[in-house]
Amino acid sequence: MPQTEEAFGTPDTREFDYAVRARGISKSYGDVEALRNLSLDFPRGQLTSVLGPSGCGKTTLLKIIAGLLSPNSGEVEVNGKPVTGPGPDRAFVFQDFALLPWASVIRNVAFGLELRGVAKSEREGIAHKYIKNVGLGGFENSFPHELSGGMRQRVGLARALSVDAQVLLMDEPFSAVDEQTRRKFQEDLLSLVQQENKTFIFVTHSIEEAVYVSDQIALLLPRPSRVSEIIRPTGIRNKGTDNIRRDPEYLDIVDRIWGSLRDYVE
């Protein structure tokens, strides 16, 4: 299936400023080809979901953008500069929380700032701000084992936001929480995208989640892994969080994406 722009949804005629650009990315693990000649642009200040079935290279692409993996060929640029490794312009929100078990919430959130040499009073002030922004005010002195899975993931998100990276990379961050918590996270994420003016790159297996939270959806298909379609659900972005899932365009996009993926689900 060829790559197509504006596959579904209201046509978007805006010209974009791209924060992240991937060009001709190929990556193999031994004889297993994870990505082949993949190119993809990520508009600045927007949330792009990378969606596709298991084994299509979503997490591999995210780690290459983060600088945690090197491609066999091709290049990623962030703000016009080639990615050669991890950098302060990118922050990663992990699927498994990746918190320090012996550290309090505020220490976990401030940890990245501590590594950068930010003074204690300044980093704690920044940490307090983002702890409040993600809905954890009052839990600053709690420890990870005292928190629910959803609360621990909020700590991870606050930590990523606190370092003021321009690009936030999120690897299925809501997969380990229950459905009610997941929906609340999705609503909060929409607010954060509007407030923070950062570029979010969001890996998910959930079609419904991708359509709900995204300004742009990159649909990846396997064998070989490639970008099949770029979808911009612009018609539902201003419907309000309570109305998006009831909108006919939302339902149509979800259904059409499933039609594209059905044959690749094992």
Regions from the PLM with identified roles:
Residues 2-9, 243-266:
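Non-catalytic connector elements of ABC transporters
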Residues 6-208, 213:
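ABC family nucleotide-binding domain
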Residues 222-252:
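Conserved beta-strand-loop-alpha-helix hinge in the C-terminal portion
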